[in-house]
Each structure stands twice: as C-alpha cells, then as structure tokens.
Swiss-Prot record:
Taxonomic classification: Eukaryota, Metazoa, Chordata, Craniata, Vertebrata
EC numbers on record: 1.14.14.80
Gene name of this polypeptide: CYP4A6
Top-level taxon of origin: Eukaryota
Keyword Acetylation: no
Subcellular location: Endoplasmic reticulum membrane; Microsome membrane
Protein name: Cytochrome P450 4A6
Residue ranges annotated as propeptide in the record: 1-4
Transmembrane spans: none
Binding site for heme: 321, 457
Membrane disposition: Peripheral membrane protein
Any single GO CC term annotated in Swiss-Prot or TrEMBL for this entry: endoplasmic reticulum membrane
Length: 510
C-alpha cells in the first residue's frame, strides 16, 4: 500500500465530496417532493373548482380563520354562505370538501367509500384496524361477525346493568352536591359509561367507578382525543418518524400503552375464564354471551379465529366508541335540559308517571317515554357526539345539483353543520323537540347522530338505551341547573367536548 493512500490530508477532500453528493441528493429529493405537492395542489384546485369557498392562503390554507379556536362558529358561517358544501384547505396541498346537505349526505353514505386514511390512520396505533378503520371485504366480514352481539335479546338484560352504573354515579353526586357549587359532570359520566361497557360488553364484576386504576384509562382516552386532533392539523406531524420524535408523539405513545394495558387485562382475564368454562355450548348454558364472548368464539369465513391483533383492535375500538361517544351524548343532553327547564320539567313528569320513585327501570319502559326521547334526540341534534366523519372517494361522484368530484377526493360529512343548517332545520340554534314527535316527517338524512348507511354505528340501539336510562334515573333524583359562570366551550374532537368542561348545579329532589 502506498504512503499516499494513507495520507490523512486526502480524507477531508473525500469527505467533502461525499457531503456534496449527499447535499445534492437531499436537494433533489426536496425538489421532487415540492413538485409532487405542487402537482397535487393543482389537481385539488381542479377537482374542487365547482365548489366556492372563502379565500385561502397558498400555504396556510384556511388555518388563519380557525386560529381563535372558534372553529364551529366559522364553519356555521360557511354553511349559510355556501350551499350544500364548501372546500376547506388545511394547508397548501391538503384540502377536503365539507358537506352539510342531507341530499349530499345520502349520496355519500349510500356508497362504500373507505374511511379517509390520511387522518384516520393516526388512530391505528391506539385502536388498531377494527370496525372503525377497516374497509372493503374485511370490514364487511367483521361487521357481519359482530352484529349478533347487538341483537335485541342480548341488549335487553343490559338495561339493569346500565341502571346500576347510573345509580352509582348518582350516589356519588349526592355526596358531592351542594346548593351553591357546580359539578363538572363529563369526567364522572365518562367513568359511568366505561363502567357500563365493562359490565355489559365484558361481563366485568364490580364497578370501575370505584376503581382508581380506571381513571388512568379515562385520562389516556382524553389525551389521545386531543393529540389526534392536534396532529391532523400540524403539517410537520404528518410524518410518522417526525411525530414519534416529538414531545406530542412520545405522549401519544405513552397514552396508547396505558389504553392497551387496560384492554389487554380485560382480554386475558376472559381467556382464562373461558379455559375453565369450556366450549361454546357449555358457556351458553351457564350464562349469556357478551361482546367479548362473540369475539373469542367467532370464526372468520375461512374458518379461522380472530388473530390476537384483530381481537385487541375490536376491543380497543368498542371500548373507546362505546364509552366516550355516549359520555359526550349524555353530558350534552344534561346541559341542554339544564338550560331549558320547561322541557326538563315535562320530561321529569313523564318519567315519574312511568317509574314512580325511580327505583328501577326495565327494557319495557324505554319505549314509553316519548317526550323524553324527543328531547334526547333534539339534544343530539344540537350537540352530536361525533361531529363529523371522513370518506375518500373510490370512484367519481355526481351530486343531485349536478356538481361532481373525481376519485381520490376526501369528503368530510359534517354532522354538526348538517344539524345546524338553517335550510334543513329552521331556527337551528333553538331547542325544539317537536320535530321529533312521533309521526313527524323529515328528510331521511337530516338527522345523523349515529351516521348512516351500511357503515352506521353498530351500537346505536345500545347507545340510545343507555341515554334513556341515564336521563330517566337522573331526572327523578336531581334537578339540573346551568352554571352561568362556566358556559361550555364546544370543541370538535373525535367526539364533541368542551374545552372548559361541562359544569352543572344539581338540586336533590328526594
């Protein structure tokens, strides 16, 4: 080997050359990415050209309009100005079409377009690919497999379990309540609905409302809600690598771990129980099957059982959707009744006439409270638990007014905007339960608290039963009053929440 080959003075030059090549490659990749984003932006501009929208910045999109946190108010102004639909630009090369017209909703919900993976994929580390995130034939197989878990015969015994969970919460409130102070109800209602899911879907013994470990799961779900919403709107956090290295990414990872620890514990306890109980027919003779039993005994069309990954995804999905959405619904229903005492009073009279002292409620009672049901539905109209859902068009679509979209466009079905659309609901901000009176006519897709079409909420009957039980048992024990100093600040997350909580004053009735 020559001396010159070992000469260290030549190394800096070689290193410099490598750095130059790396720099050029990096610049080339950057230019290619910029060109890709530019071409995608031009495609979006052409795709959405039939749909007017407010002016937007070439890079920041409409983000400036939503900086003050009044997203829902801004959106409702758009609803009044732009008929049926309006594009929203998140940033330079990302946009989706907001729709809020029942005819538009009917068209999209009648199709089999997949969920908009651009945003929904951020949920996968938390809830996996269960019924919420699956698409196509796999989704269809899982939906058909899970449907028996929501049959009326299975739902009937749940009413007593729901009532037990509600009474535990109300007993707690009775100890906390005073005439001069208010109570933040969302946290307690979240624990109650988690308790209900654990008892009904997973046959949990005892009450998670009395278990401090359950608080960490509720906190993790709240954190994941906020982190998902924040990530969707952060251009730098679209990259999984960058997000994992960020403080928010690390917090999300820890919250996912806490959520998974909870669901894994539930699954392992049931597997151990089934090993002792034996085969399906033996279990069925001993007790009723619940949601988790259906999953563990289920067979896919090819005869195989669910994988552990699929099993946890369905449990995580139902654990979240089955408690957080109903907690949102119940909390906002209570707020709506607190701010409309005349309707609250009429509901209470109806319930007292049906239940007497309210000591017990049964399946048969649920269809015998028409006015209370009307008020529940009106509260769900004003405060839909799920503000919107997204679809990515798998084929071109033409709407009834002749406007069209090509394949690939993301469409956001804004349930909140639909429910507040003055062309659909006259005086939409006024609490009026009478449009929901039995026999009243309305567009089939004007009211969508549980979405619609083949991908509607599989647990909607379970949820409605729980809402009725919670409202009925609460109104016979408490009068609900608003706290004028703490008006809720609505925030659209995965579910509709309040940034400052939902504070109510409670007055004991008995």
């Amino acid at each position: 080997m020559s001396v010159s080959a070992l000469n260290p003075t030549r190394l800096p030059g070689s290193l410099s050359g490598l750095l130059q090549v790396a720099g050029l490659l990096g610049l080339l990749l950057l230019l290619l990415k910029a060109a890709q984003l530019y071409l995608h932006r031009q495609w979006l501009l052409r795709a959405l050209q039939q749909f007017p929208c407010p002016p937007f910045h070439w890079l920041l999109g409409h983000s400036r309009e939503f900086q003050n946190g009044h997203e829902l108010q801004v959106m409702l102004k758009w609803v009044e100005k732009f008929p049926s639909a309006c594009p929203r630009w998140l940033w330079g090369s990302r946009a989706h079409l907001l729709i809020y017209d029942p005819d538009y909703m009917k068209v999209i919900l009648g199709r089999s377009d997949p969920k908009a993976q651009g945003s929904y994929r951020f949920l996968a580390p938390w809830i996996g690919y269960g019924l919420l995130l699956l698409n196509g034939q796999t989704w269809f197989q899982h939906r058909r497999m899970l449907t028996p878990a929501f049959h009326y015969d299975i739902l009937k015994p749940y009413v007593g379990l729901m009532a037990d969970s509600v009474q535990i919460m109300l007993d707690k409130w009775e100890q906390l309540v005073s005439q001069d102070s208010s109570l933040e109800v969302f946290q307690d209602i979240s624990l109650m609905t988690l308790d209900t899911i654990m008892k009904c879907a997973f046959s949990h013994q005892g009450s998670v409302q009395l278990d401090r470990n359950s608080q960490s799961y509720i906190q993790a779900v709240g954190d994941l809600n906020n982190l998902f919403f924040s990530r969707v709107r952060n251009v730098f956090h679209q990259s999984d690598t960058i997000y994992r290295l960020s403080p928010e990414g690390r917090l999300s990872h820890r919250a996912c771990q806490l959520a998974h620890e909870h669901t894994d514990r539930v699954i392992q306890q049931r597997k151990a129980q089934l090993q002792q109980e034996g085969e399906l027919e033996k279990v069925r003779r001993k007790r009723r099957l619940d949601f988790l039993d259906v999953l563990l005994f289920a067979k896919m069309e090819n005869g195989s059982s669910l994988s552990d990954q699929d099993l946890r995804a369905e449990v995580d999905t139902f654990m979240f959707e089955g408690h957080d959405t109903t907690a949102s619904g119940i909390s906002w229903i209570f707020y709506a009744l607190a701010t409309h005492p005349e309707h609250q009073h009429r509901c209470r009279e109806e319930i007292q006439g049906l239940l007497g002292d309210g000591a017990s409620i049964t399946w048969e009672h649920l269809d015998q409270m028409p006015y209370t049901t009307m008020c529940i539905k009106e509260a769900l109209r004003l405060y839909p638990p799920v503000p919107g859902v997204g679809r990515q068009l798998s084929s071109p679509v033409t709407f009834p007014d002749g406007r069209s979209l090509p394949k690939g466009v993301i469409v956001t079905l804004s349930i909140y905007a639909l429910h507040h659309n003055p062309k659909v609901w006259p005086n939409p901000e006024v609490f009026d339960p009478f449009p929901f009176a039995p026999g009243s006519a309305r567009h089939s897709h004007a009211f969508l608290p549980f979405s619609g079409g083949p991908r509607n909420c599989i647990g909607k009957q379970f949820a409605m039963n729980e809402l009725k039980v919670a409202v009925a048992l609460t109104l016979v024990r408490f009068e609900l009053l608003p706290d004028p100093k703490r008006v809720p600040d609505q925030k659209p997350r995965l579910v509709l929440k309040s940034s400052n909580g939902i504070h109510l004053r409670l007055r004991k009735l008995r």
